[in-house]
């Protein structure tokens, strides 16, 4: 299991980067396909923390933090917001995985493993 897309302003963990450290306006040829994949992740945890956008001149409320998975990768819902709005940078390994896999496929074992992994790392 791997975690991707943590933003320090929301998730202050060792593996997180500050919003300002993420490259914006990245060119993704398959952006819609990647966005569809991210949106189809299975929710494995949710918080009551309401988060606002960190983007300049954007006062949008993103909502509560939800952690999604495909059974191997785990990502927070707010990274989907920034990917759609600003084409925020995602790791090449993650993008290649998405484009090869096409659609998330998860079973209960994967879901339980993802939940356990998240508990240990968040």
Predicted regions, residues:
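Alpha-helical interaction/linker modules in multidomain eukaryotic proteins
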Residues: 1-122
């Amino acid at each position: 299991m791997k975690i991707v897309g943590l933003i320090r302003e929301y998730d202050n963990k060792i593996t997180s980067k500050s919003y300002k450290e993420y490259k914006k306006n990245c060119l993704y040829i398959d952006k819609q396909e990647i966005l569809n994949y991210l949106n189809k992740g299975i929710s494995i945890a949710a918080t009551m923390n309401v988060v606002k956008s960190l983007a300049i001149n954007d006062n949008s409320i993103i909502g509560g933090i939800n952690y999604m998975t495909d059974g191997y990768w785990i990502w927070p819902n707010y990274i989907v917001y920034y990917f759609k709005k600003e084409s925020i940078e995602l790791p090449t390994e993650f993008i290649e995985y998405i484009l090869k896999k096409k659609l998330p496929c998860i079973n209960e074992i994967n879901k339980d493993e993802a939940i356990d992994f998240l508990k240990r790392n968040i």
